[in-house]
């Protein structure tokens, strides 16, 4: 093994950025094929490639951070900056969706009947499933904070319990959202209301699924004693991401479900 006189991690050549880019191309093309031609072959191929890429890329990172010891405090600091920038980019994504929603709703065009919601649209009741979803996500925010505090205090059992509760609440939220979509009296093709509603809430739902997957990985890593009270960036990143998902939902609830109805 060569002697290293700096704190940085010199990453080995990896195929995963290439396969990740390929999977993104397949997924976006597959989504267009699904919407226009009702064919899910390309989308399924893209999702499969994406899942395999993520699994193997994260496996490599976990190996580098644990067994190979490449994640020095300096490297961890760089990863933290990276996660913060990633969350900022996600904020800008949602800013675009909120912009589209408010641009359409604050000054409805004559084609929409000059009113919001547009003529013929029956909006969902914000005091039913959406309010329950809000409670579920707020509760999950409390449980992820409990998990973080338990980890800092070295209480492994409480950390696992809190993490399991957070994952269960995330899955419950996803199931509630799926049932709401199934029963909604409008679709994504119902003009600007359907488009902005399903794109904004659907993109958020995708983030909940990604966040739940992130937390499930952390749960299994904690079972294998990967985290300590002073070295647990993987969990910290998952917690930051989950709080971001939480805050975005509050804005979605107030804007689209409550004010927009």
Swiss-Prot record:
Q: What is the annotated localization of this protein?
A: Mitochondrion inner membrane
Q: Which GO terms describe its biological process?
A: mitochondrial electron transport, cytochrome c to oxygen; respiratory chain complex IV assembly
Signal peptide residues are: none
- Output the PROSITE patterns linked to this UniProt entry: COX3
> Which InterPro entries does the UniProt entry name for this protein?
Cyt_c/ubiquinol_Oxase_su3 (IPR024791), Cyt_c_oxase_su3_dom (IPR033945), Cyt_c_oxidase-like_su3 (IPR000298), Cyt_c_oxidase_su3-like_sf (IPR035973), Cyt_c_oxidase_su3_a-hlx (IPR013833)
Which sequence ranges are listed under topological domain Mitochondrial intermembrane?
35-40, 106-128, 184-190, 257-261
Q: Which Gene3D superfamilies match?
A: 1.10.287.70, Cytochrome c oxidase, subunit III, four-helix bundle
Which coarse location class applies to the principal site listed for this UniProt protein? mitochondrion
Per the record, ranges on the Mitochondrial matrix side are: 1-15, 67-72, 153-155, 224-232
Write out the GO MF terms: cytochrome-c oxidase activity
Task: Give the EC number.
Answer: 7.1.1.9
State the UniProt keywords alphabetically: Membrane, Mitochondrion, Mitochondrion inner membrane, Translocase, Transmembrane, Transmembrane helix
The record's catalysed reaction(s) read: 4 Fe(II)-[cytochrome c] + O2 + 8 H(+)(in) = 4 Fe(III)-[cytochrome c] + 2 H2O + 4 H(+)(out)
Q: What residue intervals traverse the membrane?
A: 16-34, 41-66, 73-105, 129-152, 156-183, 191-223, 233-256
Q: Which family does it belong to?
A: Belongs to the cytochrome c oxidase subunit 3 family.
Q: So what does this one do?
A: Component of the cytochrome c oxidase, the last enzyme in the mitochondrial electron transport chain which drives oxidative phosphorylation. The respiratory chain contains 3 multisubunit complexes succinate dehydrogenase (complex II, CII), ubiquinol-cytochrome c oxidoreductase (cytochrome b-c1 complex, complex III, CIII) and cytochrome c oxidase (complex IV, CIV), that cooperate to transfer electrons derived from NADH and succinate to molecular oxygen, creating an electrochemical gradient over the inner membrane that drives transmembrane transport and the ATP synthase.
What subunit structure does UniProt give? Component of the cytochrome c oxidase (complex IV, CIV), a multisubunit enzyme composed of 14 subunits. The complex is composed of a catalytic core of 3 subunits MT-CO1, MT-CO2 and MT-CO3, encoded in the mitochondrial DNA, and 11 supernumerary subunits COX4I, COX5A, COX5B, COX6A, COX6B, COX6C, COX7A, COX7B, COX7C, COX8 and NDUFA4, which are encoded in the nuclear genome.
User: What is the recorded name of this protein?
Assistant: Cytochrome c oxidase subunit 3
What organism does the UniProt record list as the source? Answer: Neotragus moschatus (Suni)
